[in-house]
Amino acid sequence: MGLVDSLLGKDARKFLKRKDSDAAEAGRALEELRSSLYNELKTSEGAKRQQQRFCGPVVAMSFNFVVAVGIILANKLVMGRVGFNFPIFLTLIHYTVAWILLAFFKSLSLLPMSPPSKTTPFSSLFSLGAVMAFASGLANTSLKHNSVGFYQMAKIAVTPTIVLAEFVLFKKTISSTKVMALAVVSLGVAIATVTDLEFNLFGALVAVAWIIPSAINKILWSNLQQQANWTALALMWKTTPFTVFFLLALMPWLDPPGVLLFKWDLTNSSAILISALLGFLLQWSGALALGATSATSHVVLGQFKTCVILLGGYVIFGSDPGFISICGAIAALGGMSVYTWLNLPGKSIDHMSNKQLPKQNVTVSKPKAEADDGGGETGVTVVSVDPLLSKTITANIV
């Protein structure tokens, strides 16, 4: 060491000591950050704060959009080239893999803490798990028995159903300008995508029956996260077992026989596993988006994806959906832009009208007794997978 010190010199030794000190400080800072995040995950309120901090509306919806496009390609491979024509069983595999991954996270203490059981009734979690299974299963069955156009019409009907359901359940209303923007979006998507309306009686009944579970599913995911301090992963952990149970019950009724005769070789199994991993990410990203925004905004995101796929195919791959379809997609994107602008902070009509009202200062003299008691003033300050690329794509509803 003496020889090394003599070769390095005094200045070099000081430099190395300073570097060691900086590295130690960086290590301590990283350890403190890790410890802080770990402690935050130990309470539902802390976990909720971390989710809101790292997964705001833009991040969550972008994450959901990218994963949704990826699973379209994966499921097209599985259902088309691989020939796995069992959409309910594929959805069951997706949720089973998600459950296994969540159990792995829990074993490593990486799963966020759930709120106290008394804050959320067991019936709410059970209902959400059941609704998820029916929304996924009925969506796949509708796509199997109806044309893409009729399936898309049922999908568009989810938007007004959500608005009506939120009014009935929570007395939640939206402004007339938002209603008009949503109407433009729905009409534009209908013009862009509904090219045929072929269906049979059974398929039509399934499509109509799917609308309500799909709407309620989105509303419950959004409401439980925003009102009851649930995080996406914690809620997935609690509800996925119920979803798996109901999918097992639906599979004999909605899937064709012969799943055990399928060729489960390495190539086919790998493709199905990749689809399942993307299905987990789709469920997680969809839950994050619903927790960060609202059920209506999540539906608009799905319609945005539809328009982007249609216009992207026209611009990039030279497909020709027709002039009317292109105009419909552009109109829908315009409606989405207006709806997004109206949801920005301070852009609502009510907020703007309140800002225009003159403020009046009113002085009220309080009785002496009330003043002596310290009385003060208080102020009160509120897997769907798009079917356009292929009719054989399964849907994972979140």
UniProtKB/Swiss-Prot annotation:
It is found in: Membrane. Keywords: Membrane, Sugar transport, Transmembrane, Transmembrane helix, Transport. The chain crosses the membrane at residues 54-74, 84-104, 119-139, 150-170, 179-199, 201-221, 242-262, 271-291, 299-319, 322-342. Pfam families: TPT (PF03151). One of its GO terms (cellular component) is membrane. It is a multi-pass membrane protein. It comes from the Eukaryota. Its main location: membrane. This is Nucleotide-sugar uncharacterized transporter 2. It comes from Arabidopsis thaliana (Mouse-ear cress). The lineage of its organism: Eukaryota, Viridiplantae, Streptophyta, Embryophyta, Tracheophyta.
